[in-house]
Amino acid sequence: MKKQLFSALIGASLFAPMAVSAADYVIDTEGAHASITFKVNHLGYSYVVGRFNDFSGDFSFDAAKPTAMKVNVTVNTVSVDSNHAERDKHIRGEDFLNTGKFAKATFASTSVEDKGNGDLVINGNLTLNGVTKPLAIQAHAVGEGQDPWGGYRAGFTGKTTFAMKDFGIKIDLGPTSSHVELDLVVEGVRK
């Protein structure tokens, strides 16, 4: 009787639906399928737009339970690129990113809110210029699935804004230039 019960349980478990769990992904920066760009109003007349060329990170994601998502990103702030060498030197200096002292910025998620239809708010802590503050990213799950090379990918976009002074950047460029807008594109490859 015990053998029959054991066999029945094993057989049933083979045909039971598998529990879906979060998958771990590495952000695909090598294939240039991810970007961190920024925009700052320039004295109320136009915008300075740039990007960070060197960053890495990972995330876990389960479409059935997006609130369990975890995100970790590290940015090499020395890699800032606004397409103007002299300006980039200034941005790396003590007035802005102070990369001689703080060559890395990090973001670590603390919670995720599911707003429906793939819209998420990813709450976390941003450490920039030696200061750590809470930051919310308005994100959207673009899609996920098999890629042509046998891997599995998931992609997201995100936007956030923060005040420079909150991260110890004290230079006064006027009220229209006090905030940084970040645009994020993230494609992860399942580990």
Swiss-Prot record:
Main location (coarse class): periplasm
Domain of life: Bacteria
Subcellular location: Periplasm
Pfam families membership: YceI
Signal peptide span: 1-22
SUPFAM superfamilies xrefs: YceI-like
Keywords assigned: Periplasm, Signal
Gene Ontology cellular-component annotations: extracellular space; periplasmic space
Positions of transmembrane segments: none
Listed InterPro entries: Lipid/polyisoprenoid-bd_YceI (IPR007372), TTHA0802/YceI-like_sf (IPR036761), UPF0312/YceI (IPR023480)
Similarity remark: Belongs to the UPF0312 family. Type 1 subfamily.
Record's protein name: UPF0312 protein SO_3370
Organism annotation: Shewanella oneidensis (strain ATCC 700550 / JCM 31522 / CIP 106686 / LMG 19005 / NCIMB 14063 / MR-1)
